[in-house]
Amino acid sequence: MKKEHHSPWPDSLKEFIGRCIQDAEENSQPELEDEVKLLISRQYEMGNIWNVDWSSMNLESLRKLTNAQNTIIEDKKRKVEKPVSGNQFSLLSEEDEVDKKEKRRRRFENGSRSQNNAKSEELKVNPENGAIIGRSTELEKRYLRLTSAPDPDTVRPLPVLKQTLELLKKKWKEEKNYAYICDQFKSLRQDLTVQRIQNEFSVLVYEIHARIALEKGDVGEYNQCQTQLFHLYSFGIPGNTKEFLAYRILYMLFTKNRSEMNSLLANLKEEDKTNAAVTHALEVRSAMATGDYYKFFHLYLVAPNMGGYLMDLFIERERVQAMIMMCKAYRPSLTMEFLANTLAFEEMEDCVNFFRSCNAVYDSKDPNRILMKESTDRFEKCMKKHAVVDIKGQI
């Protein structure tokens, strides 16, 4: 007995139609709707509407099924039910058809609106260098290495970066949190770089970060700033060029980079040599070259600006070298007080720790004296630790 159905269309068919319509809309192929309508009409004509497993059907399998059935009945004569007209059969009800048109209209409007928004939020480009111009207004931003093209929404433009610098200067003065400050300065520098901002403000940022890094002994970060500064200076951008030229000379003494030092000296201008900081750095170089440790340690105590911080990087090495020379020049021993003054120690405790780290030999009769001959090999062994310079130095 034929099963009666209250609805002319199975629920699974309605779901199948919905899937097909969605696919057609997502793939922008409205002609697929007409094909689905035609294929389902053929199944209706053949009386198969309730026999097909619509839940597992897709458009391709429906095509194959319909084609196979058409082949089977091609030569058979049978009474064909009245074809379904557009009014009798529709993939959607009239209300659904209206909803569908409304959705299409809205999608078109949304598409147009999104295109307009895209145009209104088009990348702003600096006409001078072709770089992007950031849109972010955040004063603080963590530093993250770029793995793709910079997003203007996360990049701060120059006016915001100037506010950021003032905030960082204030926070450094009040909090002295180097980990935070270094991260923020690197983020600031990154925003300058991606926007190709190379001006006096850029120089100021790198100079301030370089000084802070020096103060905290972060050689790696200082060197990055120093390298970029001389790149900016080469464009004629004004800054504290003489101050950082002096630092560069001292840094080369630390790294023992003789080739670069010779190149720098060959390109020095007469006006550079008249600057107090540059003159001091050149005198330090001369004292080291001639082995004049008396002069060297005097210059260490009177280093201008932040030159003392740079000399701190290699002061222990020069103290060991000076002790090797004194061990050969003095016999039999020297007092701790004399050595502390000669080697420019400000605290006797630091002097004691220095000789202890080098395993210096003390006079058993007078613990306040260092035996020169007996300590020679100890200082020479200690000097080997300074043979390789760690120019990375990041903390």
Curated annotation (Swiss-Prot):
It comes from Schizosaccharomyces pombe (strain 972 / ATCC 24843) (Fission yeast). Its main location: cytoplasm. GO terms for cellular component: cytosol; nucleus. Residues 91-127 are annotated as: Disordered. Belongs to the THP3 family. It is found in: Cytoplasm; Nucleus. Disulfide bonds: none annotated. The lineage of its organism: Eukaryota, Fungi, Dikarya, Ascomycota, Taphrinomycotina. It comes from the Eukaryota. Residues 218-384 form the PCI domain. PANTHER family: 80 KDA MCM3-ASSOCIATED PROTEIN, LEUKOCYTE RECEPTOR CLUSTER MEMBER 8. Keywords: Cytoplasm, Nucleus, Transcription. Required for transcription elongation. May also be involved in pre-mRNA splicing. This is THP3 homolog C2A9.11c.
